[in-house]
C-alpha cells in the first residue's frame, strides 16, 4: 500500500519514518515528499581509461575508481553547479532519511526538471527498509543545454510503500551493506562485492 500525504505526515509525527530536517507540510502532497539538492558533489574527470570492467571494478588503462572522479566538493548556497550536456555528477540530498524495517521508499525526479533533460538517478531509485543517511543522486544531463544546479533547490520526490511485514535483513543490519549511514557523496563501492 502506497502512503498518501496524510499517512506520510502521521508516520513522520510518530517518528517511524524520519526525514531531517523535518519537511514543511507544503512539501508533502498527494503521495510524495519533495526533497532538496544538498551541497556536496563529485565530478568525473576527463580520463584516458577506455572502460571499466564491472565484474572486478578495474579500469582498463591502469586507473582505479578513485582516480576517475574528484574528491567531495562542497558548494555554498549561492554557488552554481554547472552540469554540461552528456555529463554525470554524483551529489547528495540535503535531507537525511531513516527508514523503518516495514517501509520501502521510491525516489522520483521532478517532471519539470526532466523536461529540461535532467535525470536525477541513473537507475538506483529504491530506498531500502532500514536505510539511514543521505541519498546519493546520480544526475545526468540528457538535454542540449548546460543546466545550473544550486544547493537546496527542490530536486526530487520520495514516495513510500508499506510492506506486508518487517524485512528479516534490513539494510542497516546487513554486514555487506556498502553504503550504511551514508553522509555526503559516497562513490561506487562495486569493488566491495
Swiss-Prot record:
It catalyses: dCTP + H2O + H(+) = dUTP + NH4(+). SUPFAM superfamilies: dUTPase-like. GO terms for biological process: dUMP biosynthetic process; dUTP biosynthetic process; nucleobase-containing small molecule interconversion. It comes from the Bacteria. Gene3D superfamilies: 2.70.40.10. Its EC number is 3.5.4.13. DCTP binds at residues 110-115, 128, 136-138, 171, 178, 182. Pathway: Pyrimidine metabolism; dUMP biosynthesis; dUMP from dCTP (dUTP route): step 1/2. InterPro entries: dCTP_deaminase, dUTPase-like_sf, dUTPase_trimeric. Keywords: Hydrolase, Nucleotide metabolism, Nucleotide-binding. It holds the Pfam family DCD. Belongs to the dCTP deaminase family. Catalyzes the deamination of dCTP to dUTP. Homotrimer. PANTHER family: DCTP DEAMINASE. This is dCTP deaminase. It comes from Buchnera aphidicola subsp. Acyrthosiphon pisum (strain APS) (Acyrthosiphon pisum symbiotic bacterium). The gene is dcd.
Amino acid at each position: 500500500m502506497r502512503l498518501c500525504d496524510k499517512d506520510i505526515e502521521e508516520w513522520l509525527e510518530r517518528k517511524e519514518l524520519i526525514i531531517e530536517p523535518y519537511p514543511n507540510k507544503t512539501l508533502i502532497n498527494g503521495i510524495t515528499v519533495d526533497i532538496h539538492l544538498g551541497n556536496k558533489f563529485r565530478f568525473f574527470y576527463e580520463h584516458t581509461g577506455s572502460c571499466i570492467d564491472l565484474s572486478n571494478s578495474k579500469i582498463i588503462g591502469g586507473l582505479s575508481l578513485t582516480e576517475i572522479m574528484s574528491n567531495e566538493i562542497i558548494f555554498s548556497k549561492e554557488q552554481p553547479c554547472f552540469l554540461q550536456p552528456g555529463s554525470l555528477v554524483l551529489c547528495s540530498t540535503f535531507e537525511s532519511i531513516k527508514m523503518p524495517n516495514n517501509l520501502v521508499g521510491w525516489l522520483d525526479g521532478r517532471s519539470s526538471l526532466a523536461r529540461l533533460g535532467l535525470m536525477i538517478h541513473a537507475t538506483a531509485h529504491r530506498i531500502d527498509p532500514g536505510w539511514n543517511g543521505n541519498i546519493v543522486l546520480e544526475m545526468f544531463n540528457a538535454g542540449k543545454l548546460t543546466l545550473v544546479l544550486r544547493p537546496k533547490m527542490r530536486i526530487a520526490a520520495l514516495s513510500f510503500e508499506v510492506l506486508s511485514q518487517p524485512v528479516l535483513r534490513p539494510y542497516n543490519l546487513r554486514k555487506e551493506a556498502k553504503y550504511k549511514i551514508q553522509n555526503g557523496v559516497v562513490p561506487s563501492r562495486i569493488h566491495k562485492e
